[in-house]
């Protein structure tokens, strides 16, 4: 059917020869080595889009590592959020083991500590710089109308991940899934706090105000989530959720891999 034609086109003449496997593994390693600097460069550039402005709360040199750590932190949480239901629904326990989830949890501990450090440095800069608008914006951020998203950000992104130091929690799938959901919420609040509080409390008091989302804002936000999950579910439905290459490599290394009771 149409799937066979699509897969044949995407295979591009793949026959599984020894030469093709060697080229595949070389390309695989190259792309794996390319990914980390690409992530760092992309999110650093995005952060500098903010840091190059003079908006209080944005003009900070901490933004580059802050954004990189935050991107990895939220990315790990989203991977766990998607991986755990996928593992359960499709019974992929053989390929996605508890060890994989525990290692992801350990990485979340690391990125959570880095993000927490960035929060501390950000508050320190606001107080130490003797910049009155910067300090006023920080106080407004902590105690003003948007204090709830700020404290949710601090709690969910920095303090909740510390629970993963406990091995019993780190190896518990429900606990891990719940913590990942909270981190996703916290990272969304972080983006909200960065953008809204900075623009709501700038230099000119006459421009101060509250951001009240309209139906357009809400529709765009909900539509973004719907768009992502639409393509994710279509991918899971029509393409292998686990790389067949890695499944075959695992089966070659361990004949028991792939067998189900």
Sequence positions of predicted segments:
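Alpha-helical transmembrane segments of multi-pass membrane proteins
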Residues: 115, 183-187, 233
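Extramembrane terminal tails and long inter-domain/linker segments of multi-pass membrane proteins
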Residues: 1-26, 98-99, 201-212, 221-261
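Hydrophobic, well-ordered secondary-structure elements that form the walls
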Residues: 117, 161, 191, 240
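C-terminal TM-helix exit segments that contain a strictly Trp-centered aromatic cap at the helix terminus
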Residues: 118-125, 187-197
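Membrane-interface transmembrane-helix boundary segments in multi-pass integral membrane proteins
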Residues: 61-70, 132-154, 161, 172, ...
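Long, contiguous internal "core" modules enriched in hydrophobic/ aromatic residues
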Residues: 1-153, 166, 248-249
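Central hydrophobic cores of alpha-helical transmembrane segments
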Residues: 175-185
């Amino acid at each position: 059917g149409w799937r066979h034609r699509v897969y044949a086109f995407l295979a591009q003449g793949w026959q599984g020869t020894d030469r093709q496997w060697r080229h595949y593994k070389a390309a695989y390693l190259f792309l794996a080595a390319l990914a980390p600097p690409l992530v760092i460069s992309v999110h650093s550039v995005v952060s500098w889009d903010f840091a190059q402005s003079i908006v209080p709360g944005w003009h900070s040199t901490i933004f580059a590592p802050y954004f990189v750590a935050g991107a990895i932190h939220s990315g790990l949480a989203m991977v766990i959020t998607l991986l755990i239901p996928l593992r359960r629904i499709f019974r992929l326990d053989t390929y996605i083991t508890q060890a994989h989830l525990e290692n992801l949890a350990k990485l979340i501990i690391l990125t959570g500590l880095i993000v927490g450090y960035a929060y501390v440095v950000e508050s320190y800069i606001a107080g130490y710089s003797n910049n009155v608008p910067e300090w006023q914006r920080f106080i407004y951020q902590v105690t003003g109308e948007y204090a709830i998203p700020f404290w949710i950000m601090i709690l969910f992104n920095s303090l909740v991940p510390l629970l993963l130091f406990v091995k019993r929690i780190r190896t518990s799938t429900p606990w891990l899934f719940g913590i990942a959901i909270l981190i996703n919420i916290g990272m969304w609040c972080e983006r909200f706090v960065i953008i809204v509080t900075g623009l709501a409390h700038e230099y000119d008091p006459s421009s101060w105000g509250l951001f009240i989302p309209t139906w357009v804002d809400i529709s765009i936000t909900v539509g973004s989530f719907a768009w992502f999950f639409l393509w994710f579910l279509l991918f899971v439905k029509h393409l292998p959720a686990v790389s067949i290459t890695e499944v075959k490599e695992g089966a070659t290394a361990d004949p028991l891999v792939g067998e189900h009771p």
